[in-house]
Amino acid sequence: MDSWTSPDVPALPFTAEGPRVHDTARGAITPLTPRPGQEAGLYVCGITPYDATHLGHAATYLTFDLVNRALRAAGHPVRFVQNVTDVDEPLLERAERDGVHWEELASREIQLFRDDMAALRIIAPDAYVGAVEGIPSDVAAIRAMLESGRAYRVPAEDAAADAGESPADVYLDLAQVPTFGEVSHWTPTQMMEVFADRGGDPDRAGKRDRLDPLLWRAHREGEPHWEGGSLGAGRPGWHIECTTIARDHLGTPFLVQGGGDDLVFPHHEMSAAQTRALTDDAFAEHYVHQAMVGLDGEKMSKSKGNLVLVSRLRAAGEDPAAIRLALLSQHYRTAWEWTDAHLEAARQRLDRWRHAAQTATASPSTADAEDAPAGDAVARQLAERIADDLDAPGALAVVDRWADAVLGEQTGAAAAAARAEARGVRTAVDALLGIDLG
C-alpha cells in the first residue's frame, strides 16, 4: 500500500543523546537503544479507516514521529512500519450504515489520512501495510498455532455454506502462554472490564477462557471473506494482523511498539501473546503509549462522534504547523482536553518563532557573526528535552526563551548570542519538532 511523501528532515550539526521513554511493560523510563548493527524497528498501530483523522489520532502519530526523529538524531537508522486495519467490524458497520461498499469507504478515508499526515509533516512509514495484504501470513501463523496445540477451533454453527465442511472460528489458548499479562500487568478482572468494549467476545460459547482472542472468523453471510485453506473461508482477527505484519516487516523482537494507551489491552497484550505462541520470542523490546485527548469531558472517539478533525481544521485555513504545535504543547503521557485556546496559543507561538527567526537572520549583528561558527547551545537544549521522555512542552519552552531573547529588550552580547543561534534553532526545530520556520 502506498504511504505519503515524507518531509525533508535536516541533519543536526551534532549527534543527539538517545531518547529515554516510559516503557509501559517495564513501568519505568527506559533508554531506547537498538541492538548493535541493527536498525531501530518502530511499529505504530494505524487507523481503522471508517472516519477521518481526529486530533486524538494525530497526537498519537505525532508522538511516534518524535520517537522516530529522536532516534535518527541520535544516529540510529530507523525502519518504521505502520498498518491499516482495512477490514474490521467498525469499518463494515459504518459502510453498511452509509450505504457504501466497505472497500470504497476504506480507500477514501485512507487517502484522507495520508493527506493529513503529509500536512502535519509526519515522517512516512517505510512499509505501510493493509491488513488485507497480510492475510496469507495470518493464515500461515494461525495454522502453525493450531498444529502446535496453542490454538483451538470452536464450531461456527451460523457460518456461511462456503466456510468449509466443519466451519469453525479459531482462538488462541492463553493457557498455553504463561507470559500473558507481560505488557499491561493487569489482573484478569481488570481485563474483563474492558474486553468486550474493545473488540473481545467474552461470552462466545465454546471458548476455553473468556479472554482467549479470536484468530480466525469463519465466513458469515454478508461479510467479506478470504480462502484460508484448512481454516476454511473467513477472515483474520484484529490482533493477529499486527502480529504478522510486524514480524514480516521488522522481525521480532523489534525496538518499539507504539500506539494510544487504549491499545495496551487487549491489542498489544494479545499481539505479544500471539508472538510467544508462534516463536516463544518477545514481540517488542519496548511498549510506549500516548494518553488520550478528550473533548467535552470524554476521550475523542470516532464511535462517540466527539471529534475535532484535522482535515476540517485544514479546510478552515489553519496552518498545519500550528495544529502540530498545539499537540506538542502537551506531554504524551498526560491525558488532556482539547479547546480552541490550545490552537490560538499555538498560532501565536508559531508567529513569534517565525518572526524571531526572520529577525535574527536579517540582523546586522548576525551578518557580523557569519564568519564564526553558528551557535548550537539552544539546539542542544532542545535535543536534551526531546531525549528526556519526549518532553515536547519543555522543548517548546526552550525555543520560546530564544525567541524572547531575539525579540526582547536585550542588547549587546546577550542579544547577539541569541541571534547567532538562529541557524541552529531553525535546523533543530525542523529536525526534532517537525516545524518549518520558513
Swiss-Prot record:
Mention any one GO cellular component term assigned to this protein in its UniProt record. Answer: cytosol
Record: residues binding Zn(2+) = 45, 242, 267
Chain location of the short sequence motif 'ERGGDP' region per the record: 197-202
Q: Where does L-cysteinyl-5'-AMP bind?
A: 45-48, 60, 83-85, 238, 260-262, 293
InterPro entries per UniProt: Cys-tRNA/MSH_ligase, Mycothiol_ligase_MshC, Rossmann-like_a/b/a_fold, tRNA-synt_1_cat_dom
Write the record's keywords in alphabetical order, separated by commas. Answer: ATP-binding, Ligase, Metal-binding, Nucleotide-binding, Zinc
Recorded catalytic reaction(s): these are:
1D-myo-inositol 2-amino-2-deoxy-alpha-D-glucopyranoside + L-cysteine + ATP = 1D-myo-inositol 2-(L-cysteinylamino)-2-deoxy-alpha-D-glucopyranoside + AMP + diphosphate + H(+)
- How would you classify this enzyme at the top EC level? ligase
Family annotation (Pfam families)? tRNA-synt_1e (PF01406)
The text of the family note is: Belongs to the class-I aminoacyl-tRNA synthetase family. MshC subfamily.
List the PANTHER family hit by this protein, alphabetically: CYSTEINE--TRNA LIGASE, CYTOPLASMIC, CYSTEINYL-TRNA SYNTHETASE
Name of the protein this chain belongs to:
L-cysteine:1D-myo-inositol 2-amino-2-deoxy-alpha-D-glucopyranoside ligase
Q: Which organism is it from?
A: Kytococcus sedentarius (strain ATCC 14392 / DSM 20547 / JCM 11482 / CCUG 33030 / NBRC 15357 / NCTC 11040 / CCM 314 / 541)
**Encoded by which gene?**
mshC
